[in-house]
Each structure stands twice: as structure tokens, then as C-alpha cells.
């Protein structure tokens, strides 16, 4: 075919004109491009031949056109017709007229949206579907901006109580207000609370609460709680006698009543009474449940000749010495030596307990 074209004189004339103008029909493949690239890398530059640059520019400037499909130009469908109700049938058979009318009715709404999401008008380069989506987004953004402006204005009214006309005065809500009249400077009028007034009340209350919290913190800092526990007064001394004192004398009396810290860590009167009870339980001549007993375990002695605790007739007639004059039985009898040894061992054990408690108290004071 190329030979046949060359035989035509008109074709040869057009070809000569194009060659003389320098417009050559350029066609490159990957092999030609690689060879041109290698020539540039090796330093062999052909400044006269710029066909490669023009080819690259033409490739980059080529824009792919948007071509809609053929279905975008019509609303017909090739799907078979299925009757959806008994009214579309005539005596149980398919009526061709009803079929065509139903297809025509279903085609009308499709014609209205022909090219809705396919056609892009010249100069807009967007489909109708894309334009509608942009409009909906713009409406949503405008609504959000209006809401933010309203919220900011509302906050500014809350922060500035002067907008409500209440400076330095707290206005109660309308429900809590009594039928009173206040002078606002413009005349004697009754104040009625509005939503803005209630917001101003909340702002003033929050400021007052913050001031009260600062004052309470200052009071807590100025008050020394440790000083409350530095001076401990013995309750027994207060009950025995209270000496009224004023000025320096009263301070000296209070200082005398201060109990040292060592006494606080020592065994209490309850522990001493228990020790006394344990010690007196082993005495043969004392009753451990006797409240009037002043025996502290230091000068106690076993007296077998006389027992002053029992002064009744039965006690006088009974000979207590006869119990200890007998020899100890095989199953174990309490002799004076055994009682004294037991008493001494108990006293030593109690003193060791006191020392242990004092040692622990010293350790605790050292840790504190």
C-alpha cells in the first residue's frame, strides 16, 4: 500500500512540503529511547537533533479525555420484563400494552437524571452528582460556622456580667426572687431574671467560691496542727485539782501539766494493773480481785501466821497453817519455797516485758 501511495503525485508533493518545513513524522520505540539516553550519558550530544525532547514533551502534554460509556446516552435497558402485580396481567396472561406502558413510566424518571453522574459540561468539568455533593458540604460547613459563632457569643455574655446590667450584685433566679423592688438607677422597677441573668449568677458564684477557697487555704496554712499535739495534758492531774491562772501564772501551770513524750510510750495504767493482777494471782495471802489492794509486787511476803483479809468467825476458827505444815503429797503440793520461787520468776518475767516494751518504744521514736 505504501508503494501505491508513493506512485500518487499528490501524496509525494505533500510529503516534500512537510520535509522542507522540518515537520517529520516521529515514531520511537523503547530501543530508540535507550540509544538516545546512552548517547547523552556518554557525552555525545546532538544539538541539531531535538526530536527526542519534542517527543517527550508531546507525551507529557497528552491529556486523557473522559469518554462516557454508551449506556450514558440512553435510558433503555435490555432486561426482561417481570410483572410485579396481578393488575399487570389480563385473564392470567401477559398483556403487551400493559408491558409497554409500565416500561414507559419507569423510563421517565431515568430520562430526568440522564448523565447525572456521567456528563461533565464544558467549562465546569464536574458532573451534576459532584456539584450536588459540593453544595451539601458547603451547607454543612456554614451550619457549623454559625453554631460556633453563636456559642462564642453565648460564652462572651457569660464571662461579661455587664451585659446583663448586674455589676457587684448577685441576682437570684425568678423562681427564688421575692416580690421586692430594687432601685437600678433608672427608677424603682422589679428585676426579673432572664437566661442571661442566670448565666451571670453562675459566673459570680464561681468567682466567690474561688475567693472562699483561697481564704480557707490561707487559714489552713496559718494554723499549726502540729502544735496541737505538742502539748499533752494528763486528765488525772486536771481532775485532782484545777488551778485557775491568768497571764504568766496560768501558762506556768499549763507547762507543769505537760506530759513528757517518754511517758506516752511507756506502759499505761491498764498494763500495770494487769501486771499487778498476774503478780498477785501467785500470792497465797492476797486476793487478786481485791480493788483496795495496794500491793505492787515489791514488798509482798508470804505470811502464813496471820491473814487480815478474813476476819469472820469461820476464818478465825480455821487453821491455815495446818495446810502448809503437812508434807507435800505425791500429786504436787504448794510449799512456801515453791511459791516464793514462782513469784520471783514471775517478777523477773514482768520486768523483762517492761524492758522489751521500752526498747520498742525507743525504736519507734528513733524511726519517727
Swiss-Prot record:
Iron-sulfur keyword on record: no
Modified residues (Phosphoserine): 293
Pathway noted in the entry: Protein modification; protein ubiquitination
Biased composition (Basic and acidic residues): 149-162
GO CC annotation: anaphase-promoting complex; nucleus
GO terms (BP aspect): anaphase-promoting complex-dependent catabolic process; cell division; deactivation of mitotic spindle assembly checkpoint; mitotic sister chromatid segregation; negative regulation of anaphase-promoting complex-dependent catabolic process; positive regulation of protein autoubiquitination; protein ubiquitination; reciprocal meiotic recombination
Region (Disordered): 140-167, 286-336
Alphabetical keyword list: Cell cycle, Cell division, Mitosis, Phosphoprotein, Ubl conjugation pathway
A molecular function GO annotation: ubiquitin ligase inhibitor activity
Entries under InterPro entries matching the protein: APC_su15/mnd2 (IPR008402), Mnd2 (IPR016807)
Function: Component of the anaphase promoting complex/cyclosome (APC/C), a cell cycle-regulated E3 ubiquitin-protein ligase complex that controls progression through mitosis and the G1 phase of the cell cycle. The APC/C is thought to confer substrate specificity and, in the presence of ubiquitin-conjugating E2 enzymes, it catalyzes the formation of protein-ubiquitin conjugates that are subsequently degraded by the 26S proteasome.
Self-association state and partner proteins as the record states: The APC/C is composed of at least 13 subunits that stay tightly associated throughout the cell cycle: APC1, APC2, APC4, APC5, APC9, APC11, CDC16, CDC23, CDC26, CDC27, DOC1, MND2 and SWM1. MND2 interacts directly with APC1, APC5 and CDC23.
Record-stated family: Belongs to the APC15 family.
Name this protein carries in UniProt: Anaphase-promoting complex subunit MND2
Organism: Saccharomyces cerevisiae (strain ATCC 204508 / S288c) (Baker's yeast)
Gene designation per UniProt: MND2
Amino acid at each position: 500500500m505504501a508503494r501505491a501511495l508513493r506512485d500518487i503525485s499528490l501524496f509525494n508533493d505533500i510529503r516534500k512540503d512537510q520535509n522542507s518545513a522540518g515537520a517529520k513524522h516521529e515514531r520511537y520505540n523503547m530501543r530508540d529511547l535507550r540509544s538516545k539516553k546512552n548517547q547523552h550519558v556518554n557525552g555525545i550530544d546532538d544539538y541539531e537533533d531535538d526530536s527526542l525532547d519534542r517527543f517527550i514533551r508531546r507525551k507529557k502534554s497528552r491529556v486523557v479525555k473522559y469518554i462516557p460509556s454508551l449506556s450514558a446516552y440512553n435510558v433503555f435497558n435490555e432486561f426482561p420484563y417481570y410483572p410485579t402485580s396481578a393488575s399487570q396481567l389480563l385473564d392470567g396472561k401477559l398483556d403487551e400494552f400493559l408491558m409497554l406502558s409500565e416500561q414507559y413510566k419507569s423510563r421517565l424518571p431515568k430520562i430526568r437524571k440522564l448523565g447525572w453522574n456521567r456528563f461533565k459540561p464544558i467549562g465546569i468539568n464536574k458532573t451534576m452528582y459532584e456539584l450536588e455533593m459540593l453544595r451539601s458540604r458547603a451547607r454543612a460547613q456554614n451550619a457549623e460556622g454559625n453554631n460556633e459563632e453563636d456559642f462564642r457569643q453565648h460564652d462572651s455574655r457569660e464571662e461579661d456580667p455587664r451585659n446583663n446590667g448586674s455589676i457587684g450584685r448577685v441576682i437570684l433566679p425568678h423562681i427564688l426572687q421575692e416580690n421586692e423592688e430594687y432601685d437600678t438607677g433608672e427608677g424603682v422597677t422589679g428585676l426579673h431574671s432572664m437566661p442571661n441573668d442566670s448565666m451571670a449568677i453562675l459566673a459570680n458564684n464561681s468567682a466567690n467560691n474561688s475567693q472562699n477557697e483561697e481564704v480557707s487555704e490561707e487559714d489552713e496554712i496559718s494554723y499549726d496542727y502540729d502544735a496541737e499535739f505538742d502539748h499533752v495534758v494528763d486528765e488525772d492531774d486536771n481532775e485532782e485539782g484545777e488551778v485557775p491562772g491568768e497571764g504568766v501564772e496560768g501558762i506556768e501551770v499549763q507547762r507543769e501539766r505537760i506530759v513528757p513524750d517518754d511517758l506516752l510510750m511507756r506502759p499505761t495504767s491498764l498494763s500495770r494493773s494487769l501486771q499487778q493482777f498476774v503478780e498477785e494471782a501467785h500470792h497465797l495471802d492476797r486476793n487478786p480481785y481485791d480493788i483496795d489492794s495496794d500491793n505492787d509486787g515489791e514488798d509482798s511476803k508470804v505470811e502464813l501466821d496471820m491473814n487480815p483479809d478474813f476476819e469472820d468467825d469461820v476464818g478465825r476458827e480455821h487453821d491455815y497453817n495446818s495446810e502448809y505444815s503437812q508434807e507435800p503429797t505425791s500429786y504436787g503440793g504448794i510449799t512456801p519455797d515453791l511459791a516464793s520461787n514462782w513469784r520471783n520468776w514471775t517478777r523477773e518475767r514482768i520486768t523483762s516485758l517492761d524492758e522489751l516494751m521500752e526498747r520498742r518504744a525507743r525504736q519507734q521514736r528513733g524511726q519517727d
